[in-house]
Structures are given as structure tokens and as C-alpha cells.
A protein has these predicted regions:
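A conserved helix-loop-beta module that forms one wall/lid of the active-site cleft
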Residues: 1-34
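Hydrophobic residue at the +6 position relative to the catalytic HRD Asp in the kinase catalytic loop
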Residues: 119-121
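Short beta->alpha connector loops
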Residues: 6-10, 59-61, 115
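Phosphate-binding site of ATP-dependent enzymes
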Residues: 17-18, 27-112
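Protein kinase-like catalytic core scaffold
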Residues: 21, 54, 76-77, 117, ...
Length: 159
């Protein structure tokens, strides 16, 4: 979705306007990240997040985040409860991503030219939407990723 980076909370409210937006601190590893949702009117009062801020149009989707983890061209999936529904959690369940999600994740990888990344996707009524990309994510909850990483690095070293 359209995303803006702003430096002050006043700019957060201006960027949101009448739209519902998701606001979070830019950067960092994602642990303990606070997310606030609202319109400019609802975002008048500063919420204690650290600047700079990401202001992202709200995507109407279910209460599940589709986390896609890539090691080279290999894509693994983890379903996690949305932090908007339950707050931050490390719990999730591995799943086999649909071909359209695999293709989307690979497109992001190709565009960024990264070997290791995480792509957070929400599935809305109009289709999947990338809401976050992490270079070298934690891969927590993905049982075969250590072997995938080792195999990928060995193959790259041998090339």
C-alpha cells in the first residue's frame, strides 16, 4: 500500500488525512514494535513511538499475516496472527504458500537483489499486498531454514 516516511507526529496526522492508516516506527528488528491505526483525527495525540515513522494506508484483510521467508529462490511460509488483532507475538504456524504468493515473494527478491529476506503479505479481497520487507529476517518458526541457509551459502561459495 502507499507508504510515507515522516519525521514528526504532526506529519503523521497530516499524512493520514481522512484515510485509516497504520503507523509504526521505521527501522529496527521488529521486536516490540508498536502499531497504531487511525485517521488524522484519531492520531492527534502522540503515541510514544520513536521517529521516524512509517505511515501506511490500512489494508482490509483477515486477522492473519502471511510471512514469506526466502533463502535464494526457496520460499517458506508462516501464518501469524496480525499484530493489529493480538499485538506482537512470535507464535505462528508453517504453511505452504500458494503459487501467487511464491511468485510475489520472488518478484520482491529479484527487485531488491537479496539472497535472504522476509516478505510480509496481507491477503485482501483484491489480492495479496506486500506490507513489509525485512533483509535477513529471524526465520523463527521455520524448521528447515538453517539447512537451506547453509546449502545456499555453500553453493554460493563454490560458484
Amino acid at each position: 500500500p502507499p507508504t510515507r516516511v515522516v519525521a514528526t507526529w504532526r506529519e503523521v496526522a497530516a499524512a493520514a488525512g481522512e484515510r485509516r492508516c497504520v503507523v509504526k516506527s521505521a527501522g529496527g528488528p521488529g521486536r516490540g514494535v508498536s502499531i497504531v491505526v487511525g485517521t488524522a483525527e484519531e492520531l492527534r495525540v502522540e503515541r510514544g513511538l520513536d521517529p521516524p515513522f512509517l505511515v501506511q494506508d490500512y489494508v482490509v484483510a483477515g486477522e492473519v499475516d502471511h510471512k514469506l521467508y526466502l533463502v535464494g529462490d526457496q520460499v517458506r511460509g508462516l501464518l501469524k496472527p496480525s499484530p493489529l488483532a493480538v499485538g506482537h507475538t512470535t507464535e505462528g504456524a508453517p504453511f505452504t504458500p500458494a503459487p501467487e504468493l511464491v511468485d510475489l515473494a520472488r518478484q520482491v527478491r529479484a527487485r531488491l537483489d537479496l539472497d535472504f529476506l522476509g516478505v510480509d503479505v496481507l491477503v485482501s479481497e483484491s489480492g495479496p499486498v506486500v506490507v513489509d520487507v525485512n533483509d535477513f529476517p529471524g526465520y523463527r518458526g521455520m524448521p528447515d531454514v538453517p539447512e537451506l541457509v547453509a546449502d545456499h551459502l555453500l553453493a554460493r561459495a563454490a560458484a
